[in-house]
Design a protein with these regions (language model features):
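N-terminal intrinsically disordered, cationic/polar leader segments
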Residues: 21-23, 32, 40, 126-127, ...
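Conserved mixed alpha/beta catalytic, RNA-binding, or beta-rich assembly cores of soluble enzyme
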Residues: 26-82
Length: 176
């Protein structure tokens, strides 16, 4: 599908969530945070979240996009409102960069498979990557593409009219 004549440009800050239609381009910049994009190829609807942490300690009345669990529930709410099913969406996941690679005392992330392991982990980027994979699978989605982990930050651009997402990684400076 061609780029629409009038494009709505959305920039997500940490904790933001947006779900829209074919006239929308969503951008964000990620460090240790993670973004999940979802796109419905027939209806040309979809969205992106930019979460900061896997889950909230305690409870609240409203869903908060700063937390992965709640961001996924925001997606599920929009999917229900559109009378669609999770299996109809194409999912891509980005981010989880190690922003302080020199301080990483344990090397690369170990696989984290449950809430207890995720809670116990001290590396927020590893926690965010693990919870993304876990929640996406739990709710019946399949990840079509991902760009996760590594060092430093990245910019993500997601076009809802086409479902395409682009990632631009920043060159990381190393102090000597």
């Amino acid at each position: 599908m061609q780029k629409p004549a009038h494009v709505i440009e959305i920039f997500l800050q940490p904790g933001d969530f947006y779900f829209g239609d074919k006239n929308t381009r969503i951008r964000t910049v990620l460090g240790s945070c993670v973004s999940i994009t979802m796109w419905h190829p027939k209806l040309h609807i979809g969205g992106m979240c930019h979460y900061m942490l896997p889950f909230r300690q305690g409870s609240a009345a409203e869903l908060d996009g700063r937390y992965a669990e709640e961001a996924l529930h925001l997606f599920l709410r929009e999917i229900r409102l559109a009378n669609t099913r999770p299996s109809e969406y194409r999912v891509k996941v980005f981010g989880g960069g190690d922003m302080f690679p020199g301080l990483n005392r344990r090397g690369r992330c170990e696989p984290l498979t449950n809430r207890e392991e995720i809670s116990a982990c001290r590396n927020v980027s590893c926690k965010n990557v693990a919870i993304a994979r876990s929640l996406v699978a739990l709710h019946g989605f399949k990840i079509e593409a991902e760009d996760l982990g590594g060092d430093g930050h990245r910019q993500v651009i997601f076009d809802i009219w086409s479902g395409h997402a682009w990632v631009r990684k920043a060159l990381t400076a190393v102090a000597c």
